[in-house]
């Protein structure tokens, strides 16, 4: 049965006012606590607003799915589970949640317990009362290790300098999108999306709410340095002309240096009747220019690979099963 047919089964139910999307990857130890916090601090506190919770199992190999099914048995009409065939990455999991959300707005929060669920009450008020299409919770502080703080500051600092000047200093992955903004996100079929960049690019009225990200109590992060680096490249190469521009300026600089060096050699030959001898100057020039050429080819290759990925129109995820 396809996804649309499965969704039609909800035609006789009231459309939720908001959908909470939670990507899950090796989070077996924190899922019950997350759902309990959502139920007591958000779902039961917003009279007149009906919500739904969508968990996306992104190919977890632990007992996350079993825990989710147990949670659903306790909240059969409130919880939905989207199981992907394998691990497609957090961004793809969030996009799967977007596609299956039925609410008038959608809130994305992690399953690790580091983001305070009670902020959703302020987010919902900002959207339904103040009319903001986008509400972003920004990390003004982090109860994390020095290394994680440093890498995060470097990551989002580069994004702020090179691609998105409106990127909050601490970045974000806890946010609300109104239905207009969500539909725009769904219509974007970018192959290697930088999710935060897409949200900022939309340009809708946005409210920022600051908070301190809590220390992780259960489990460990699967957001490795390699994944961060790949995501950083997606954000820079997909939304900034800086890499190509810096290569162009570097090429121009070395061309000018080569021209002036040729003039110096010519003057030396005219005045002294001798040319510069030896392998050292030649090898320096060859190695420097060769390295720059390889660097430039690598950069072009990154752009070409992303272009190839885009024209394939490959699905960002594959749904294995939907537990409605």
Question: Residue spans of the language-model regions?
Answer:
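Hydrophobic helical membrane-anchoring modules
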Residues: 2-17, 157, 194-324
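Structured catalytic core of nucleotide-sugar glycosyltransferases
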Residues: 2-144
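Short conserved micro-motifs on helix faces and helix-strand junctions that flank
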Residues: 23, 84-86, 109, 175, ...
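Residues in soluble alpha-helical coiled-coils and helical-bundle/repeat scaffolds
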Residues: 26-29, 114, 186, 190, ...
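Conserved amphipathic alpha-helical interaction elements at protein-protein interfaces in regulatory
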Residues: 40, 44, 70, 74, ...
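Acceptor/aglycone-binding surface of glycosyltransferases and processive sugar-polymer synthases
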Residues: 84-86, 90-100, 105-108, 114-198, ...
């Amino acid at each position: 049965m396809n996804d649309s047919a499965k969704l039609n089964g909800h035609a006789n139910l009231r459309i939720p006012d908001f959908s909470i999307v939670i990507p899950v990857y090796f989070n077996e130890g924190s899922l019950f606590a997350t759902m309990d916090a959502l139920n007591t601090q958000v779902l039961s506190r917003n009279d007149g607003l009906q919500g739904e919770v969508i968990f996306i199992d992104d190919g977890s190999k632990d007992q996350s799915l079993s825990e989710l099914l147990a949670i659903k048995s306790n909240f059969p009409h409130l919880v939905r589970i989207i199981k992907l065939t394998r691990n497609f990455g957090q961004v793809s999991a969030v996009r799967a949640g977007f596609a299956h959300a039925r609410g008038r707005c959608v809130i994305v929060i992690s399953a690790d317990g580091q983001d305070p669920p009670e902020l959703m009450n302020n987010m919902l008020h900002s959207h339904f009362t103040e009319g903001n299409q986008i509400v972003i919770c920004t990390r003004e502080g982090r109860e994390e290790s020095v290394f994680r703080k440093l890498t995060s500051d470097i990551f989002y600092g580069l994004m702020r300098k090179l691609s998105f000047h409106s990127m909050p200093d601490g970045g974000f992955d806890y946010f609300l999108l109104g239905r207009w903004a969500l539909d725009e996100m769904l219509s974007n079929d970018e192959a290697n999306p930088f999710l935060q960049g897409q949200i900022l690019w939309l340009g809708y009225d946005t409210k920022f709410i600051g908070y301190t990200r809590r220390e992780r109590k259960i489990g460990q992060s699967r957001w490795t340095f390699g994944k961060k680096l790949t995501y950083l490249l997606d954000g820079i190469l997909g939304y900034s002309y800086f890499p190509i521009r810096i290569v162009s300026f570097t090429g121009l600089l070395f061309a000018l240096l080569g021209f002036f060096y040729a003039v110096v050699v010519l003057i030396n030959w005219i005045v002294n009747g001798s040319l510069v001898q030896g392998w050292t100057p030649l090898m320096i020039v060859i190695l420097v220019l060769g390295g720059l050429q390889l660097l430039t080819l690598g950069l072009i290759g990154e752009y070409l690979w992303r272009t190839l990925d885009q024209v394939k129109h490959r699905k960002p995820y594959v749904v294995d099963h939907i537990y409605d």
